[in-house]
């Protein structure tokens, strides 16, 4: 009776608690559980008896609530068995913090999983000196992204494994700490700090055997910072000052973040890593060559490595060596590898031809007429021949793929044997080392050499297995849009006769066309200066003589699209405050984060024609801004980006000296300007711009005035343009010679050049054509005739207006 009387109140209380749990938020549930546990503490014997009778699922819920209460209210634990019941019996023991949140680089070096590191001997020696200090033994690697900061750490790990370090660093473990995984999944306040302290405790227990590497060390500032807690940097500061060996890495810009905390920055000893030279990069690529050959199953020629270093340094300007050169080699190898995994072009062509024949045979199967039967027999013979050829090429392709795979496996085995040799030498297993050095490795080297020699024989090769300089050039061209490939025969002919292509659009300006053509040929031949733009020109002359049109024609020749000109109308930059729009507004101003119009356009199109139209209308500060562009081929925008102009053609047009050309020139039949007048125009320009600006322009070209003979050629060009527009309607336009002469006479204006002719054609021909098209007097597929009647230019209709109305009524 006493037992039931004692048990009943507690059961009622638990039932009420369950009801409250279902109807109230979680916080009230925790409070009710707390009260229940307090009542258990008041009567321990009754509580123990009650708990022994509760089912397993109830025990589990109490255990969970107990764990939550312990963390929130500091209550003592129940029996450990209750908590353990919730645990998975198959759960693995927790990993050590260093293994969980870090990567052991020395272990990777022992297994041969790190790439070889070439050079950087001085920087590695400096890092070893700092690590050997008693306090503040924390080197900080500072350098641009891609110069090899992380690779230097890999090199240090390899030296530790090889024993090429002082005794104080031998047998040490170099562990790369992952700050991302350290903070990922930290749900409760203080959990991140607890993880970090566990890592530091394990490092302390190692008694100096562990060296920590932290990449992107600027992330320590503010990492894990919440209300009332410390960030990671404040937790690490005491350890860094008392002997914790920590190597860090960051960029020049991000090191400024660390410098804002003097207490943290003084604990690191900076080591500056400069970008390696082109020759050093070539040495690095030669050291990595074998790893990439084994991975991709291809061969890499030495000329490809040299081209990767040279071309990346020349054309990829927003990144740094050796990273960008390694990327070129890697991508070129990947392209070749994908070609190996897909069918060659010859086999694909045969597949398509066989499919076409099979479809045609299927359609002729039921035909019995002699012509169809004869055609079917011819197709069957052709199909048999093509199938035989396909089988032959497929066998060759399969054999070549197997041969390439065999070479790849042999190289992989050779590399693994060399790794085992180094391991045996470190461990003192000289018997196995002798077997590897004098037996297995020479056999594998001989096998690789014989396989490559047989692959280079005179037999037919469907697969190209060597990465050459041409492959590197193609990758550069795809990445940057700059044509760096070897000039093909068709392109050679096109470049040699470039003047003829430009003269199809611009006539009467032979000197300017020749100067631009020479500049483009120099660039494609690889003979331009590496420190300046391809060319810079100032086009002078009266309005309407073809200055802007020649620039558009150049863009069409280079890019097959005249809209590929980066054009700036300098009338928009007349005021001083508008000049900043070219490179971006200063910090604090509107649109200061969007960059400049000029710099952003060239960053996205590094190979382009940049046109500054009507340059004399711009503010004088614009010419000062272009001094560095014309001389050094680069410009820095408001965001600090260094924009490369070395692959651009700079063209400035101006009407300076127009009055001299109109008044002082004796115009001949060809419209050419004499030397004395040209000198006067150039002198007028020199008075308008400072000498340092004039001296940086490659060539000042004075455009000839348009004579009537030249204007007659322009009439033909404009009529051809109209014909191109009418091609969609299957229409043609036909002008008599008399009509063309009429346009030449009426459209000629010594002051305004060719623009009056354009307006005349628009007014006299296009307006009438538009009216007749709408009325149906000229229809699609017909020829538009233009003649001269009674000294007037007339477009002749092909149908009467009334006839069109009747047809429309019938419809």
Swiss-Prot record:
Induction: By heat stress. Expressed at a higher level in respiring cells than in fermenting cells (at protein level). Residues 345-430 form a coiled coil. Belongs to the ClpA/ClpB family. Its main location: mitochondrion. It is found in: Mitochondrion matrix. Residues 467-658 are annotated as: NBD2. ATP 1 binds at residues 143-150. It comes from Saccharomyces cerevisiae (strain ATCC 204508 / S288c). Residues 1-44 form a transit peptide. Keywords: ATP-binding, Chaperone, Coiled coil, Mitochondrion, Nucleotide-binding, Repeat, Stress response, Transit peptide. Residues 98-344 are annotated as: NBD1. This is Heat shock protein 78, mitochondrial. It comes from the Eukaryota. Homohexamer, forming a ring with a central pore. The hexamer is stabilized by high protein concentrations and by ADP or ATP. Oligomerization influences ATP hydrolysis activity. The gene is HSP78. ATP 2 binds at residues 541-548. GO terms for biological process: cellular response to heat; mitochondrial genome maintenance; protein refolding; protein stabilization; protein unfolding. Disulfide bonds: none annotated. One of its GO terms (molecular function) is ATP binding. It holds the Pfam family AAA_2. One of its GO terms (cellular component) is mitochondrion.
